[in-house]
Amino acid sequence: YGYTRDFPVEQYWRDNRLNMIHEGTHGIQGLDLLGRKVLMDDGKTLDLLAQRIGQTVQQARGYAELQAESAAVAQGLQTLLDATRAAWSTRQPDEALANATPYLQAFGHVVVAWLWLDVARVAVAAAAGQEDAFLRGKLQAARYFFDFELPKIAAWLAVVAARNPTCREMQDAWFE
């Protein structure tokens, strides 16, 4: 067989060629997101996403247990929107898109935080003061994301907002 692992999941991953194609397109997807998708219809699609996230934040603010998480999503969204505007403030695509990959990573984290906030809101409402292990697990998983993953967006969006030139200025000749 040529594959000596005890568990087949690694072989399934390796044999599915599409996974490797997706891994190789991370940068392209970031360029597409920051360079095309958030600009579509004069930013209306991004505005719609922001409105929907804002609605969930408002609903979650109705629960005392979710105040910190609601504030974190609201702040994350605002940081993302500010970085988007800052990236395009000079209207120079080479400056705006130089850090498209960290933008993609941060954008994804904000969306996942939004989804976790909604899961947490539903869990708190369903528990209604009762102790339920399944719902407690949902809340704890959400809190993990808010405590360990969402804070990463600050660093990613800082280079986007500053239009940091480090990657853009790299030259192939420096590796010859």
Where are these regions (language model features)?
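Alpha-helix capping/hinge segments and adjacent helical runs
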Residues: 1-48, 144-167, 171
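C-terminal amphipathic alpha-helical interaction region
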Residues: 37-40, 52-176
